A protein has these predicted regions:
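A beta-strand edge to alpha-helix "cap/lid" segment located at domain peripheries
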Residues: 2-37, 42-174, 179-263
């Protein structure tokens, strides 16, 4: 039994690695057919400019020629938690002006109807561009939660931001899965221990709050897309976007992945 589980997990990791390569290639070649096959109905994507698009909006954008070239994933890491597959990766590419470019992303897959389907993508560039698309958002058209799940995830999301604001390590210690990884605004990724150590330090910004919260639930997968607003140390207004992924096991939601963009 143990060997079967290990082989099954290894096979799933290989499948997700193949899907990641296919995703990057399809994005480079504007292959909407690939995405139409592999994106879940509930799919939503967070873009570098702070905008949020649903599946239809994403396919429309992918259908346009990509001005960048030579896109390739770098230091890709795949992990599986229950029916969630998470792909964290950096990437490099050539800009239209032939300069080198870099970024990072977190793509999340759910094992739905017998196969892995992408339910969420959070895509960021380095350095981060201004969040000019922050007001462009998408409504939840698939995966709308029932009232109980919506209330539970809404509360968890609110306290997540509060705990960041107040450096509340205990809250995170109680609500993060052991496999948790955070995608940071600077392009690095932090495991659970590193994230908790970061949270323990006083936050550099003030008045941090969540806005435009979108919550989806697919079976035991909770997906939260939202914006942040805050005041920078120099007094200027700041904005960002985040995607948090929650997994429900034994009746409890725990956060398995977070990705943060700040402009």
């Amino acid at each position: 039994m143990g060997n079967a589980v290990v082989k099954g997990r290894a096979s799933d990791v290989q499948t997700l690695e193949q899907l990641n390569r296919g995703y990057v290639h399809a994005g480079q070649t504007s292959d909407t057919g690939w995405f139409d096959k592999h994106l879940a109905a509930c799919f939503m994507a967070s873009n570098p400019d702070g905008s949020l698009v649903d599946r239809a909006g994403f396919l429309e954008r992918i259908g346009r020629p990509n001005p960048s070239k030579n896109m390739a994933p770098v230091d890709t890491r795949v992990r599986i938690v229950g029916d969630i597959g998470v792909v964290d990766s950096g990437f490099q590419y050539t800009k239209p002006d032939n300069q080198d470019g870099a970024g990072h992303y977190t793509d999340v897959y759910g094992f739905i109807e017998g196969r892995w389907q992408c339910v969420s993508a959070h895509f960021a560039l380095r350095p981060a561009p201004p969040q000019t698309g922050g007001a462009k958002t998408a409504d939840v058209v698939s995966g709308a939660p029932n009232a109980v799940d919506h209330a539970a995830l809404w509360d968890l999301n609110h306290h997540y931001i509060r705990a960041v604001r107040e450096s509340d390590v205990c809250w995170f210690d109680s609500n993060l899965a052991a496999e948790f990884v955070n995608g940071n605004a600077d392009g690095t990724f932090s495991d659970r221990a590193a994230f908790l150590a970061f949270i323990a330090k006083p936050i550099a910004v003030s008045n941090l709050r969540e806005e435009d919260v979108r919550i989806q639930v697919v079976r035991d997968i909770g997906i939260i897309h939202a914006r942040t607003a805050y005041t920078k140390p120099d007094g200027q207004a700041g904005a960002g976007r985040y995607t948090d992924i929650w997994w429900r096991a034994a009746g409890q939601w725990r956060c398995v992945s977070a990705h943060v963009t700040r402009g």
